């Protein structure tokens, strides 16, 4: 994994609502504001590490590839499919972002990439006329090494996601210049894992805010997450649900991410985890 060092720090839990769904998935509607009373009562020791180095976006280290996408026409993703594939090089410490109509599978080939699985992929969706960005991270599953460090991988991905989102906005800058309203789109982050504890979905709010660093240098402790009782499903309108039939307000008609989508199935079924 492209982690430089691991440190230990005392990290307070964040205020959040958690909702368990079927297929061993957890939906977390997270807030970045901290409960001062809770912070005084308990603290958690959790590992911290870096996936892409310091959590500071450096445009000079980002290489952008437009594959089958006309960079100058900056067509709206609500009319033409648009995805992001972001990978990291341990050798050069550079990020490579592919902007295309589907996930750039060639970017994910090779034994090293398959071993590390530190890529981040994302797609734009229009659901009932509202745009949202769906970001996917692979935490564990596939081989035992990832399972052994699933917790560490979860913290790393979550810590570095603001950098990833900034890379999307910077790399696809012409699109956002032409359609600045996309920065108000809701960001949904999917953490894929064979371990229920880390198999979860988080709502990060508007892209403009999600790309900003947290108020404090922290990550969400899983122990704190498990403390909050899962009492109800997301309220109507929170989870982006497609229209049941063919329509013009939902696009694309199917997901462009070739990963399991048990999170979406669970939310659509509206069934809490047993």
Swiss-Prot record:
Xref: InterPro entries: Staygreen
Localization per record: Plastid, Chloroplast
Main location: plastid
Protein family according to the UniProt entry: Belongs to the staygreen family.
Species whose genome carries this gene: Oryza sativa subsp. indica (Rice)
Keywords: Chloroplast, Plastid, Transit peptide
Protein name per Swiss-Prot or TrEMBL: Protein STAY-GREEN, chloroplastic
Task performed by this protein: Involved in the disassembling mechanism of the intact light-harvesting complex of photosystem II (LHCPII) in the thylakoid membranes. Required to trigger chlorophyll degradation during natural and dark-induced leaf senescence.
PANTHER family assigned to the protein according to its UniProt record, in alphabetical order: LP06106P, PROTEIN STAY-GREEN 1, CHLOROPLASTIC-RELATED
Pfam families: Staygreen
A Gene Ontology biological process term: chlorophyll catabolic process
A single Gene Ontology CC term: chloroplast
Transit peptide residues according to the UniProt entry: 1-48
